[in-house]
């Protein structure tokens, strides 16, 4: 995924009200920007650290700029715009980054399950169906362990139940961790944050739901999922 034009460097002041952040531009001007992330962004929000913004160039938008990348306490980059995760995963699947998911037609946001959900990506090959749910990982612990979720996720638990449901119907079901953190080397459930999700994730794996984690390279010009990581349950 290319950023055209490249992202704009700034300094993060604070993140608040879930969807807002204050930053200081290179000119010294302090502005409020959109922060498209519903999670806690734990270990990602470091006051006075470098960050990167995209420019909508849309004068009708209340907040012209969007927070895209932040610098963590360890100096890594984390991609906090969760709205980009689905497109990154679709791009990676089409590029063959995960061989197990190659050779399918791809549709977005299709209805599925028994709880009124929409799957992020539906892969089709003849009569075969593969349901792919995408989750963005930005929480990292010392040593490179990536954790999900970074806050209690009722919605995430619902999606795991839906994946188990379609797997029981004979379809492939996939949970895809989109790792937008350059310091993450493996992914695990964040049991200390959401024990229910961790338990459900292990149940889902035992029921045949496939789990993949792929780490992105991140920069002001491009984000790209490149490297498969181990998932430790």
From Swiss-Prot:
Top-level taxon of origin: Bacteria
Record-linked CDD domains: SfsA-like_bacterial
An example molecular function term from Gene Ontology annotations: DNA binding
HAMAP family in the cross-refs: SfsA
Family: Belongs to the SfsA family.
Full protein name: Sugar fermentation stimulation protein homolog
Lineage of the organism: Bacteria, Pseudomonadati, Pseudomonadota, Gammaproteobacteria, Cellvibrionales
